[in-house]
Design a protein with these regions (language model features):
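Short, Lys/Arg- and Gly-enriched loop/turn segments at beta-strand edges
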Residues: 12-17, 111-115, 127-132
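C-terminal interaction-tip segments
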Residues: 4, 8-11, 44-58, 62-68, ...
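Acidic glycine-/aspartate-rich tracts in secreted/extracellular proteins
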Residues: 20-23, 29-33, 68-71, 82-85, ...
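Surface-exposed loop/turn positions
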Residues: 3, 14, 39, 56, ...
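Intrinsically disordered, low-complexity Pro/Gly/Ser/Thr-rich segments with frequent PxxP/GP/PP motifs
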Residues: 83-117
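Predominantly extracellular/luminal cell-surface or secreted proteins
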Residues: 27, 78-82, 135
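Small/polar beta-strand repeat architecture
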Residues: 3-44
Length: 139
């Protein structure tokens, strides 16, 4: 649960909320009007790239997300807000060409409270190298 659903019939950022024996439930409705059996749906697992330490705050300065594969990949980055149990998207479904990178800057100096985190989703396993600029220990 918590994986992102990647399909043209789901809004970017749609997540799996529960998994049953014969079904998967998402946190948003599909825009598709045909049966799910006739479509391909991909689930992207998350990687937590950073978690703010207990009792402190951190500020995201920026980051570089490098594609280390021979193919284009798609990248989504979320900020996990532990106090609200919410994960707003910082960027969603960004294409990163092979041998290239996506640079995150001017994030408005986003403040992360304790246990908040940066979560990275990619449509190809182990395809993105992440380097984050974070100011730690802010009170």
């Amino acid at each position: 649960m918590g994986d992102i659903v990647q399909n043209t019939n789901f809004i970017a950022g749609t997540k799996v909320s529960s998994i049953g024996v014969n079904s998967t439930t998402c946190d948003r409705d599909s825009t598709n009007t045909t049966a799910a059996s006739s479509q391909s749906v991909k689930y992207l697992g998350l990687t937590t790239a950073y978690t703010s330490a207990s009792g402190t705050k951190s500020i995201i300065i920026g980051g570089t997300f490098a594609n280390n594969t021979d193919s284009e990949v798609e990248l989504t980055v979320h900020l996990y807000d532990n106090s609200a149990s919410a994960t707003p998207a910082i960027v969603s479904r960004i294409p990163v060409p092979n041998g290239s990178s996506f640079v995150l800057r001017d994030t408005g100096k986003t403040v992360m409270e304790e246990f908040d985190g940066i979560r990275v989703y990619c449509d190809t396993a182990n395809a993105i190298d992440v380097q984050l600029g974070i100011l730690k220990g802010v009170n």
